[in-house]
C-alpha cells in the first residue's frame, strides 16, 4: 500500500497516491533550485509566527538554528531530496524535522500554504536571475560600445532590405545594436518594480486567520510590499510571463546582432574576422572558421520564444485561484535563464574580439549607388522639389549603371541632360565621407553625433549597472 510519506498532505486520505500519480506530481528534479529561497523565507516566516505569539523565543531560536543548519547542508550537498519527497517544500520540512524534531519543525507550516510559498519563492528566484541576466546583457553592450570607440571614423555600407542604401559609420551600426539591449535591461528594471510584491501571507487563497503580518515578511525578504489581493497573489503568473517575454526579446536582439556577424564574416562580405578563441572549425574542411556562437544565438532564440509560448499556453483559461497547472510555470523560465547565462558571456567575448576590415568596408560603402540620396538632397538645397530631385537622382543612377561607372564619374553634359540645374558642382557631395558628415541631426551617422550616442550609451549602461545592484547574482 502506498503512503503519503514526503507529502505535506494526507490526513484526508486512507492511503497514498498511486505510483503513476506520485511520479507525475514529483517536482524536486527542478524545483530544488528554490531550496535556498525556501529556507530564507522559512526563517522570515518563523519570525512572523513569533511576532503573532504562535512561537516562544526558545522555539523561534530552535527553528532558526535548524533552518540555518539545513541551509548549510543544502549548499554543501549533504542534504538532498529523497525519492519519496514530492517537492522542495516537503523535502525541506522533512530535513528540518530531522534536525529539530517534529514538535518544533511541525510548527513552521502554520499560516502558510504551498500556494503562497511557491509564488513568493519563484518571484525571489526570478528577481535574482533577472539581475544576473541584466549584467550579462550590459556586458554585451559594453563590448559593442568599446568596438564603436575603437572605430570612430570607419565607414561601411548601410543597408535596407539587405540592399545597398546609404553609407554609415560602423560605430553607428554597432551602437544601433546596443540600444535595444539597453531597452531590454530597462524592461527588467521596470518588471522588477511590479514583481517586488510578496504573496507570502496569502495562504492557499483566502489569507490567514492567525494574525500574521504579510508586510513584515515582505520587507524581510526584500520585497517592497505585500500583495493587495490574496487570490491574485497565489494564482497569477503574469510576472513570469513578462520575464519570459523579456528573455525572449533579449534572444531576438542577440539573434539580429548574430545575423550581422554571420553575414559580415562570409567571404562575400569580408567585413570581419572572428577570433580563434570564439569560433570553431570543420571536421572535414580545414579552411573553415565557423561562427558557432552567433549561430547558437539564433538557434537558442527559438527555444526562448518556445518557452514563452508554452508558458502563455499553460496560463490561459485557468479559473481562480491556484491550479496544479502552475507546476509547469517554472521549468520554461529556469531553462530560459540557463540558456541566456550560457549565451551572454559568449556573445560578449565574440563581439569584443571581432577584427573589422575597415578598408574593405570603406571600399564597398559607395557600391550600389549609395550616394544617390546625397545627389537628390543637393538638388533640394538648390530649390528643386524633392519629387523632381528624386526622379533626377534615379535617372542618374540608370545612366551611371549603363556606363558601368559611379555617380561621381558622370560628365557635366550627362548631368545637364538629366536636369538643367544638375551641374558638376554636385560632385562635392558624392563622397562617402561627405555623405556621412552631412547627416548631423540628432541620431544621425555624422561622427560627432555618433560620438554623442556612444557617450549616452555608456552613461545609460552605468546607470543600469547601479540599478541592478540589489541582485546578489
UniProtKB/Swiss-Prot annotation:
This is Argininosuccinate lyase. Its main location: cytoplasm. Belongs to the lyase 1 family. Argininosuccinate lyase subfamily. Pathway: Amino-acid biosynthesis; L-arginine biosynthesis; L-arginine from L-ornithine and carbamoyl phosphate: step 3/3. It catalyses: 2-(N(omega)-L-arginino)succinate = fumarate + L-arginine. It comes from the Bacteria. Keywords: Amino-acid biosynthesis, Arginine biosynthesis, Cytoplasm, Lyase. Gene3D superfamilies: Fumarase/aspartase (C-terminal domain), Fumarase/aspartase (Central domain), Fumarase/aspartase (N-terminal domain). GO terms for molecular function: argininosuccinate lyase activity. It is found in: Cytoplasm. The keyword Lyase applies. Its EC number is 4.3.2.1. PROSITE patterns: FUMARATE_LYASES. One of its GO terms (cellular component) is cytosol. One of its GO terms (biological process) is L-arginine biosynthetic process.
Amino acid at each position: 500500500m502506498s503512503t503519503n510519506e514526503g507529502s505535506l498532505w494526507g490526513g484526508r486520505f486512507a492511503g497514498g497516491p498511486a505510483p503513476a500519480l506520485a511520479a507525475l506530481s514529483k517536482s524536486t528534479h527542478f524545483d530544488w533550485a528554490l531550496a535556498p529561497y525556501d529556507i530564507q523565507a522559512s526563517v522570515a516566516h518563523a519570525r512572523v509566527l513569533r511576532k503573532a505569539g504562535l512561537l516562544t523565543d526558545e522555539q523561534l531560536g530552535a527553528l532558526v538554528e535548524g533552518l540555518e543548519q539545513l541551509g548549510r547542508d543544502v549548499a554543501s550537498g549533504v542534504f538532498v531530496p529523497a525519492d519519496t519527497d514530492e517537492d522542495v517544500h516537503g523535502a525541506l520540512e522533512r530535513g528540518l524535522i530531522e534536525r529539530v524534531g517534529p514538535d518544533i519543525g511541525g510548527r513552521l507550516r502554520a499560516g502558510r500554504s504551498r500556494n503562497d510559498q511557491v509564488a513568493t519563492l519563484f518571484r525571489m528566484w526570478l528577481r535574482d536571475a533577472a539581475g544576473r541576466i541584466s549584467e550579462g546583457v550590459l556586458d554585451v553592450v559594453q563590448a559593442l560600445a568599446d568596438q564603436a570607440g575603437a572605430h570612430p571614423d570607419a565607414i561601411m555600407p548601410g543597408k535596407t532590405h539587405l540592399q545597398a542604401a546609404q553609407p554609415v559609420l560602423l560605430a553607428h551600426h554597432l551602437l544601433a545594436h546596443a540600444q535595444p539591449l539597453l531597452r531590454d535591461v530597462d524592461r527588467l528594471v521596470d518588471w522588477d518594480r511590479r514583481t517586488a510584491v510578496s504573496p507570502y501571507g496569502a495562504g492557499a487563497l483566502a489569507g490567514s486567520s492567525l494574525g500574521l503580518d504579510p508586510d513584515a515578511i515582505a520587507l524581510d525578504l526584500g520585497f517592497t510590499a505585500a500583495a493587495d489581493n490574496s487570490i491574485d497573489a497565489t494564482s497569477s503568473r503574469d510576472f513570469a510571463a513578462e520575464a519570459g517575454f523579456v528573455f525572449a526579446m533579449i534572444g531576438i536582439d542577440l539573434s539580429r546582432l548574430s545575423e550581422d556577424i554571420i553575414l559580415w564574416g562570409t567571404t562575400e562580405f569580408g567585413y570581419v574576422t572572428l577570433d580563434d578563441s570564439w569560433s570553431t572549425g570543420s571536421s572535414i574542411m580545414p579552411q573553415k572558421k565557423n561562427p558557432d556562437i552567433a549561430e547558437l544565438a539564433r538557434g537558442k532564440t527559438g527555444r526562448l520564444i518556445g518557452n514563452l509560448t508554452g508558458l502563455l499556453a499553460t496560463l490561459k483559461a485557468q479559473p481562480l485561484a491556484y491550479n496544479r497547472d502552475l507546476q509547469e510555470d517554472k521549468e520554461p523560465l529556469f531553462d530560459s535563464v540557463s540558456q541566456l547565462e550560457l549565451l551572454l558571456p559568449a556573445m560578449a567575448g565574440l563581439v569584443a574580439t571581432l577584427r573589422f576590415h575597415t578598408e574593405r568596408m570603406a571600399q564597398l560603402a559607395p557600391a550600389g549607388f549609395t550616394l544617390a540620396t546625397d545627389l537628390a538632397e543637393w538638388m533640394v538645397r538648390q530649390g528643386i522639389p524633392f519629387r523632381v530631385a528624386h526622379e533626377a537622382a534615379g535617372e542618374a543612377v540608370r545612366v551611371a549603371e549603363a556606363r558601368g561607372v559611379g555617380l561621381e564619374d558622370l560628365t557635366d553634359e550627362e548631368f545637364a541632360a538629366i536636369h538643367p540645374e544638375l551641374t558638376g558642382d554636385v560632385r562635392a557631395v558624392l563622397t562617402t565621407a561627405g555623405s556621412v558628415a552631412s547627416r548631423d541631426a540628432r541620431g544621425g551617422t555624422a561622427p560627432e553625433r555618433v560620438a554623442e550616442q556612444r557617450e549616452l550609451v555608456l552613461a545609460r549602461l552605468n546607470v543600469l549597472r547601479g540599478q541592478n545592484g540589489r541582485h546578489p547574482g
